Amino acid sequence: MDARTWRLGWRCLLLLALLGSTRSEGVESCEEVRKLFQWRLGGAVKGLPEAPRAGPDLQVCLSKNPTCCTRKMEERYQIAARQDLQQVLQTSSSTLKLLISRNAAAFQETLETLIRQAENYTSILFCNTYRNMALEAAASIQEFFTDVGLYLFGADVNPEEFVNRFFDSLFPLVYNHLINPGVTDSSLQYSECIRMARQDVSPFGNIPKRVMGQMGRSLLPGRTFLQALNLGIEVINTTDHIHFSKECSRALLKMQYCPHCQSLMLSKPCMGYCLNVIRGCLAHMTELNPHWHAYIRSLEELSDAMHGTYDVEHVLLNFHLLVNDAVLQAHLNGQKLLDQVNTICGHPVRTPTQSPRCTFDPSKEKHGMKISARNGEETLANRRKEFINSLRLHGSFYGGLADQLCVNELAAPEGRPCWNGEEIVKSYAQRVVGNGIKAQSANPEVRVRGTDPVVNQIIDKLKHVIQLLRGRSPKPNKWELLQPGSGGGMLENSSGDCDDEDGCGGSGSGEVKRTLKITNWMPDSMNFSDVKQVHRADHGSTLDTTSTGCASGTESMALPLMGTLMFLPWLW
């Protein structure tokens, strides 16, 4: 035999030994075990066996053969086995966790942008149409949309209260500038009396009630949707760091590290053996599966139902139209309101005043928000649909987790020599049990006892959020779905369930039916107490915020003209 043939044969034998395809009989040194122990666990090699020996003190890695392990090594290996399983759990859930967390952040950012645009539209309405009261209305507009954001993102604020507060603060401005224009009372007490009288004299008709209904129907589902996404992240974070029982830890040690004691460092467990161990360890987690599936289904149902007056995007971007209707209604009933206010609050001290008007500061033009033209309409509803379609792929995540870990990470391929808990064999001979707690009564590798309080708590939270999600989903025959009409406005659904209070009809000045385009831009800086200006552009539009208000030029604009300019197709 020449030297080349001898070297090749030696390398083959060495490779077979490293692959764990040979028994540990005849192993004379524990040097490789010592090195791997030090590298993997960072432990000192002092005191570790240099050669295989009897291990009478071992509790899990029992063998009739000499061993390279000690009791202390066994304890360290058991900790490492638990950490290894947690690591593969976190790796397996990382895609799902990233999907939910990124979309939760994107939805929140998009809602923040929607609120800013809706505030801009409302400010534009006053600046272009009711210029005399624009600066005075700015604080109330800002406060209203701040409350909208607080509510959407989970704060304890009441939509009915902030809607009433907005219209209460609007009435004195409308009274002083439209109903009794050119004169005002220097006393704050008189303005406060007008504000307090708003709900009694109803200057805006049923519009505040319509706004309350629309805000309630749209903001609450949006708020619940965001809260549900955050709970989904919490569920994954909790299961990523689940506590494993003592029986599970011993089984993991036996499966993952007991081969090391026989110098079989690169061996992998048999598929059936791995399934029994991991299904036993994750038995309680598997019980999450039906609730997780129902959670995703409930998210989908709520998302599908968020249309028309249930769609926060539609409601926010059309809020200014209802405000315009409210101001017009008060103006049309001016004489009646004048008499009612005089009866309740008395006659004002007639002091001619000049209200501050909108002006445009060109130096602030750089703070404008540019909306670029895009090939498609990427709306919040479309983004929700894409997210739900991706999330649906993970509907059985917890039910198939054990199988996924064994197939993709832990077990040897079928037909290959593998570790069965005692030695290297061609196949696993024990019965393979199914998933779930009930199936584990016959598990030969892991004894599963009782219930897991942490998993039970997660299940309770999922049940609760499922009830919330389903409670926020309107029944199909109650949806106020808005469909594009041939005249450029919106048509009510044919069910007859949608009335004026539902807000299905527009004001006639151009309802915003196609909504926010989700873009990558964000304004450099914005001051939302400012009054806003809109400029036309050939291939897009620019919403500019200025420190003092709107464009100079015509002192007032007719409502139809303002609506036409604001809602031309190029704005979208």
Swiss-Prot record:
GO terms for cellular component: extracellular region; Golgi lumen; plasma membrane; side of membrane. Glycans are attached at N120, N237, S486, N493, S495, S507, S509, N527. The keyword Plastid does not apply. The gene is Gpc5. The lineage of its organism: Eukaryota, Metazoa, Chordata, Craniata, Vertebrata. This is Glypican-5. Belongs to the glypican family. GO terms for biological process: regulation of signal transduction. It comes from Mus musculus. The keyword Secreted applies. It is found in: Cell membrane. It is a lipid-anchor; GPI-anchor. Keywords: Cell membrane, Glycoprotein, GPI-anchor, Heparan sulfate, Lipoprotein, Membrane, Proteoglycan, Secreted, Signal. Residues 1-24 form the signal peptide. Cell surface proteoglycan that bears heparan sulfate. InterPro entries: Glypican (IPR001863), Glypican_CS (IPR019803).
